[in-house]
Amino acid sequence: MSILQKLVLASGSPRRIELLQQAGIEPDRILPADIDETPLRAEHPRSLAKRLSTEKAEKAFASLKTETGYAPSFVLAADTVVAVGRRILPKAETLDDAANCLGLLSGRSHRVYSGICLITPGGKLRQRLVETRVRFKRLPREEIEAYVASGEWRGKAGGYAVQGLAGSFVVKLVGSYTNIVGLPLYETVALLSGEGFKIHQSWLTARP
């Protein structure tokens, strides 16, 4: 990665960091943006994902500009929302949250939306919205209880981690798999490269 190009990730999510690394992108800095993620009244899940990703990117960008010795950087932010119809599911933090989410998702289709927002060093804002449709099998009570006991769901939108045990719940998936994990790679890489970020430079020195 060129020393002239810095990438700041406005998220502390280990999953997003790992996904970027999977694409050969190593953020120069992790700067989580703490914002109020409460949906607005009657806000559509798509709109929520876009709004929160924008607010995260803008907050991180503004914070960077106040720092002494600020170096112009690309700022990348994302937010993932899971919804059944227009009903937005929470990022599960309690056992009840997780059990309620899984009960609602059991045997049904839902959608996973990710808003991606990129602010260039010059302050230009670019955004993408990615949607994935997912259908879960019918989950018996015992399976829900076992999954909740695993703790894997904690902090996850919709109360599950598709890259873990919950991968066995998926009957059908239409769209980006990495979107469900937390960051749609194809769209993220396209957004960065479209604004001149040298995505492939680090690939040249990557070891097999």
UniProtKB/Swiss-Prot annotation:
Cofactor(s) this protein requires: a divalent metal cation
Catalysed transformations (reactions): dTTP + H2O = dTMP + diphosphate + H(+); UTP + H2O = UMP + diphosphate + H(+)
For biological process, the GO terms are:
nucleotide metabolic process
Q: Does the keyword Signal apply?
A: no
Q: Which Gene3D superfamilies match?
A: 3.90.950.10
Record-level GO cellular component terms: cytoplasm
Q: Drop me one GO molecular function for this one.
A: dTTP diphosphatase activity
Asked if the record carries the keyword Cytoplasm, the reply is yes
The record ties this protein, via InterPro entries, to: ITPase-like_fam (IPR029001), Maf-like (IPR003697)
Which parts of the sequence are marked as the site Important for substrate specificity?
A: R15, T80, Q163
Enzyme active site:
D79 (proton acceptor)
Q: What is its EC number?
A: 3.6.1.9
Q: Which family does it belong to?
A: Belongs to the Maf family. YhdE subfamily.
User: What is the protein's name according to its record?
Assistant: dTTP/UTP pyrophosphatase
Q: Which organism is it from?
A: Mesorhizobium japonicum (strain LMG 29417 / CECT 9101 / MAFF 303099)
